[in-house]
From Swiss-Prot:
UniProt-listed Enzyme Commission number(s): 2.5.1.n9
Record bears the keyword Transferase: yes
Classification via InterPro entries: GGGP/HepGP_synthase_I (IPR039074), GGGP/HepGP_synthase_sf (IPR038597), GGGP_HepGP_synthase (IPR008205)
Binding site for Mg(2+): D15, S41
One function term, GO molecular function aspect: heptaprenylglyceryl phosphate synthase activity
UniProt pathway annotation: Membrane lipid metabolism; glycerophospholipid metabolism
Enzyme class, spelled out: transferase
Catalytic activity: sn-glycerol 1-phosphate + all-trans-heptaprenyl diphosphate = 3-heptaprenyl-sn-glycero-1-phosphate + diphosphate
Name of this protein: Heptaprenylglyceryl phosphate synthase
Residue numbers binding sn-glycerol 1-phosphate: K13, Y160, L161, E162, Y163, S164, G165, G190, G210, N211
HAMAP family linked: GGGP_HepGP_synthase
Protein function: Prenyltransferase that catalyzes in vivo the transfer of the heptaprenyl moiety of heptaprenyl pyrophosphate (HepPP; 35 carbon atoms) to the C3 hydroxyl of sn-glycerol-1-phosphate (G1P), producing heptaprenylglyceryl phosphate (HepGP). This reaction is an ether-bond-formation step in the biosynthesis of archaea-type G1P-based membrane lipids found in Bacillales.
GO terms of biological process kind: glycerophospholipid biosynthetic process
Length: 229
């Protein structure tokens, strides 16, 4: 049975711009993870997105596109996650590209499939932070304030704490979790071991596991039981 995103506990994030062989992809899709999020910071094209979608669709797992550019948007996903980078220094990453997208696709958009994410990028060395000019030197109370804004002002369904390749601060994740009631807390970044997954699982509604898939698929698979226990 496919779970709605509100019920996801564990998600794998697959990058269309990275190579993954068929056996590893099958292991990921059949693993018991709750969903697959397709997205990346660079090199994401319509071609490689479509290729990855077609390969994932051989399996019954729920599949969402995290939109990183307008060119790679294609029908066929269960959900379309749209990041609004709350700590970006550039308005285009907060609402500008969103305006362009709605201007172009508004009449044909299915709003039931669209999931807005308040995105807070925490790793200054990540591609995502550079791309979006994210202000990452934030005190915990800054991040908590962004979380409150995302839930109570913007009423987005998801607040995504993105550490993008480095392991974050479990205490901050706990603090954020304590102020969110309706908005779901997604945590992504640097989870490579069972122990790291276990540290974040009590606080994040959804734990996102990405990069380790491409280095050690068995380590990636081991995070599922750690999150769901």
């Amino acid at each position: 049975m496919m779970l709605e995103f509100q019920e996801w506990r564990h998600v794998f994030k697959l990058d269309p711009n990275k190579e993954l062989n068929d056996d590893d992809l099958e292991a990921i899709c059949e693993s018991g993870t709750d969903g697959i999020l397709v997205g990346g910071s660079d090199g994401v094209t319509l071609d490689n997105t479509l290729q990855l979608l077609a390969r994932i669709r051989r399996f019954s797992v729920s599949c969402a596109l995290e939109v990183s550019n307008l060119e790679s948007i294609t029908p066929g996903f269960d959900h379309y996650f749209i990041p609004s980078v709350v700590n970006s220094g550039e308005v285009k990453w907060i609402s500008g590209l969103h305006h362009e997208a709605v201007k172009e696709f508004g009449p044909i958009m299915n709003w039931d499939e669209i999931v807005m994410e308040g995105y807070c990028i925490m790793n200054p060395d990540s591609k995502a932070a550079t791309l979006t000019s994210a202000k990452t030197d934030l005190a915990n109370e800054d991040v908590v304030a962004y979380a409150r804004m995302v839930e109570n002002m913007y009423q987005f369904p998801v607040f995504y704490l993105e550490y993008s390749g480095t392991f974050g601060d479990p205490q901050l994740v706990e603090e954020v979790s304590q102020v969110l009631t309706k908005t779901k807390l997604f945590y992504g970044g640097g989870i490579r071991t069972v122990e790291q997954a276990e540290q974040m699982a009590p606080f994040a509604d959804t734990v996102v596991v990405g990069n380790v898939i491409y280095d050690d698929v068995q380590a990636a698979l081991a995070t599922i039981a750690a999150v769901k226990k």
